[in-house]
Amino acid sequence: MQKNLSRIKYFIKKISKISKKNKKKTAFLIGNTSKSNNKQFYLTPLREFNKVILFGAIIYNEKIALQISKIVDGKVDYIFVDSEKKIKTSNIYIGDAANIERTVRENISKSNLMTYKGNDLTVEALDLLISNRSRNEIKGLGSKKISILGAGNLGSKIALKLVERGAKVLIYRRNLKKLRLLTKALNIIKPDSTEQKISYSNNIYKVVKNADVIIGSTDGIPIIDKKMLLNSKKNVFVVDVGKGTVKKEAIKYAIEK
């Protein structure tokens, strides 16, 4: 952990030099996730845009949020904190629910603080990406088969968004009981006037068979393999919105094709 904290200090100095040279704002993003060993965190890549240069960290508990906040406050123009409450147990507020946003708010006084919801940004970005790929087609996403592997919070939101566009959405999750409940709930939530319905299967190869699009939304579990690409349509579009959902063999095969 100390190594990554030192890297934060190093990258802050690096983006500060770039920002002064190119007259750009600087920003640091603090994201949070429930999947962890509660000890480590990792840094996101440094990204430079027209008006801002930024990087960030994905963290697993409030004590790490506290340490990072003290390091970056006043060193960047903006600090963005993920406001989604994904962590159950607090390791700072005894007897209270975990709250990364609160921890950051209490320890930021110099930089401009803003909040965001990481999963919602991902859903909007993915929706824009996939819909734009079909912009020259008369039906758009209508009737396209889209397979979503990993029907958690993120996968479920994506499924709802795409079925509303008229796509044939199939979802997969290892826990069959939750998979059935999610499918039922999503079909209740979607507009009554939307004719398409979300389907499910606990057979992952059945879900991806003849798919136009395969979306991997598992958290740190490589799930998309070569066999899935062979079972899908020739020009299947594969998107990884999780954390490394595509196996190396599948990437190699896709490059070859």
Regions found by a protein language model. Name each.
Residues 1-108:
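N-terminal ligand-binding/catalytic initiation module
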Residues 84, 218-220, 242-243:
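Short glycine-/small-residue-rich Rossmann-like dinucleotide-binding loops
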